[in-house]
Amino acid sequence: MSNESLTIIDNRTGKQYEVPISDGTIRTMDLRKIKVSDDDFGLMGYDPAFTNTASCKSRITLIDGDKGILRYRGYPIEQLAEHSNYLEVAYLILNGELPNEEQLKDWTWHITHHTFVHENIKKFVDGFHYDAHPMGMLIGTVGALSTFYPDAKNIFDAESRKKQIYRLTAKVATIAAYAYRHRMGLPYVYPDNDLSFTGNFLNMMFKTTELKYQPNPILERALEVLFILHADHEQNCSTNAMRGIGSSHVDPYSALAGAAAALYG
C-alpha cells in the first residue's frame, strides 16, 4: 500500500479501496470503482460551487490570499510589479518565461499593430444607450469581433491562434476606451502606438484637444502595475467560463465575451 494514497472502507459492503493521492488531490473518477453492485454507477463527488474541486492542473498562477501570495509562472508579483511592464507579464503568462530583448520587441510590435478596430465597430458602440454599463458594451462588442474575423474559427491552427492572441490583447483595450468615451459623449480616439501599452490606453481614454497626448508618468506606471496585478487570477469564475466555452471549439472572441460576462456578475 502506497503512502501517497487514501484508504476508503465502504461500510455498505465492507470492501476496502485504495485511491492514489497526487499533489494533495484525488481523482474523483477513482471513486467510481466504489460500488454496491456490479451494475451500480459508482460513487460520485458532490461539491456545490466547486469550492473544493480542481478542474485542471496549472503552472500559470498561484494565489494564496491568506498568506498574501500571488505568483505568475513562479515569479512573485512584487518582482514583476517593480521591474516589468504589462506586455512583458502577458508574454510570461502565455509562454512560461519572461521575454528577452528581441522577443519583447517582436511581441510588442505584433500587439501595437493590432490596436486599431474596424470602423464599423464605432457604429456598433454608437448603438448602445448613452448610459449603458461599460461591461455590457465590452461584452457585446468583443462578441461582435468574431464576425469580423471568421478565420478565428480555425482554432486547431497554431498560427491562427497566435493571431487571435495578438488581436484580443490589443483590441480589448481599444474597445474598453471606446465604451468609456461613449458614456462620456466624447469622440473616439485612435490608438497612438508611439506610446506604451498603458500610455496608449490613457490616450484613448482621456485625450481632448491636444495634438499629442502625453500621459502623466506616475499615472501611467500606476496603471501598468494595476494591469499586472489583474493579468491573471487563477481558476476564478471567468477563467472557468472561458475554458468551458472554449471547450466547445467556439472562436476565442465568443469565449472571451462569455468570460467577461462571468466577470461582470
Which sequence ranges carry the predicted segments?
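Hydrophobic alpha-helical bundle cores within soluble ligand-binding/oligomerization subdomains
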Residues: S2-G265
